[in-house]
């Protein structure tokens, strides 16, 4: 809590959770049934979130962590964002440029892994006519391309990076 001119204001900190972090901290336990991730979740003033792709990836690699994550999402302890929800949020600040903005953020995220990653996997988004494409058609194309990316190609990390970039942009625009 922070006091500003006699008023109490809550300062929130945001923690973006990814597949590796959840999986590894869930696997670390004390002598009982207490997981390290549960201790992390007790950190005060934190808001935890992840991209929905993380749920998909955890289901591939870990038996218990997906159940734990689903319970936390259901209890609203962790917010899981889909691409559709991200685009809806972007629409509030970017209007008709929401899809183009998402594509720019996706390209930045892909560039972290390889300068060719975006052109290899998401070329169709770069060539899209953003003055004509609907959000629904954009999401269908994005989903199709994500499926083509497939397993073991850093999709969870890329989606997390996009969510982080867009979250930073939205926070700057609102504050």
Tell me what each language-model feature is.
Residues 2-169:
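Active-site-proximal, substrate-binding regions of enzyme catalytic domains
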Residues 174-175:
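A two-mode feature
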